[in-house]
């Protein structure tokens, strides 16, 4: 057994305050990392549901224009579906409308999707309900509409159309991106309202297996290349647009959160490191005679430093474990209860999302542990200044 570790096991590091500080630092670090990951996961998922990761749309970039449909069976679509990262391809029909309920009037966007679309298939009944829609909870709140009500909607164009939709469900909006209220309807109903033939849609949304920003941008470029390469003369003109370019403010905001998390990680690591430095200095002063004795027995400064660094490392690991456990408990409680709420108009989501990614937590733990141990090399310089002749007294 290494003599340094043997001696370290018999030294007592009286650093409860330092250990508490380390535990708090790791608690804050892990929560910050989990919240950042949670925001990114929720907003990506919400945007993917709202408009897909990549959209094929008319060059006008206006999916609400009923005068420029595209073809969901265009000649390039088989190649789009065969892209490696594509998880699903969803044709959709958009139309802006005005909802009137009593004296209340609200502008909405109706998004017609196939009835078998994964996130809406359970909401739409399989029976013969005419013009079923699923409305967002925000619209239900401000208009007073609820499941079972009829929703009178006006469509303004060359001539005004009115339809009585039936509210079959109320869904929670995952991401509040702007003031628009998106109502989900049956795509075939919306095609009839727009006066379109089957196969004509407003846009085609591509959902990816991995919606990381770089993957989204890369797949949008690949989709655009395939469209240009395999379009026929009969296909309407389309362009591929990524959600990153459609909602740059959201991704910029996520990058800002990541920067803040990095700042917190560095700050809390430095705080924990300096608390450990003060604790280690106290330990060195209390054991100055022991240091002198070890030197007189022929132990090198490096070996003696290993003694105290080993003892300090045990304390750091204990604080790390305590902080990690407390952080994971917090994440579990927040994920199950959503006790910490947010204003979605400012934060895009209605509660604090947490996603304790184990790989990220492990990387944060290792990085902060290495930094703290490097900082502890500073007080170890004191060991070289100890003179055995002055510290060891023979009685």
Q: Over which residues does each language-model region extend?
A:
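A structural signal for hydrophobic secondary-structure junctions
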Residues: 74-199
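Peri-transmembrane interface segments
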Residues: 14-16, 215-274, 283-285
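Hydrophobic, regular-secondary-structure patches
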Residues: 31-107
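Transmembrane alpha-helical interface segments in multi-pass membrane proteins
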Residues: 281-283, 288-334
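A hydrophobic alpha-helix feature that marks transmembrane segments and, especially
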Residues: 33-38, 258-296, 304-307, 379-380
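Short cytosolic juxtamembrane segments of multi-pass membrane proteins
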Residues: 381-395
